[in-house]
């Protein structure tokens, strides 16, 4: 049986629209404030970059993006707070390679695994 190309294209377009229906049923993201956890004290370069990006994202998303500085232990305190947070996209670590790559070699007994506790979202520089 031969199906004309026009019918095939209409069938594929209809299937694509049906596949997109579940996405429309989801809640709009974000529906509450987003928190950038900076694992360093306020005033440093990582904090400054986080605040600039938070200001722009607040304008773009129409939802607050809050910077929460949790400095100490070379970034481990803030990184641990993010690792323990609910993985729902509302708590994001705005950090450097220290808490993720270097500290794992320097500190014993870390409560998080930098290889499995985080998902990269973007690079900022």
PLM segments and residue spans:
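N-terminal export leaders
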Residues: 5-10
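A short glycine-rich beta-alpha junction/loop motif
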Residues: 122-125
């Amino acid at each position: 049986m031969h199906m004309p190309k026009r019918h095939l294209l209409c069938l594929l377009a209809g299937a694509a629209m049906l596949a997109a229906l579940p996405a429309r049923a989801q809640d709009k993201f974000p529906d509450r404030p987003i928190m950038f956890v900076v694992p360093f004290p306020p005033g440093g370069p990582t904090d400054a970059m986080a605040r600039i990006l938070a200001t722009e994202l607040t304008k773009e998303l129409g939802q607050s993006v809050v910077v929460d500085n949790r400095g100490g232990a070379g970034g481990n305190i803030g990184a641990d707070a993010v690792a323990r947070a609910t993985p729902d996209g509302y708590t994001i670590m705005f950090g450097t390679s220290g808490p993720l790559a270097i500290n794992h070699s320097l500190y014993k007994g870390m409560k998080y695994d930098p290889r499995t506790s985080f998902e990269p979202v973007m690079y900022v520089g």
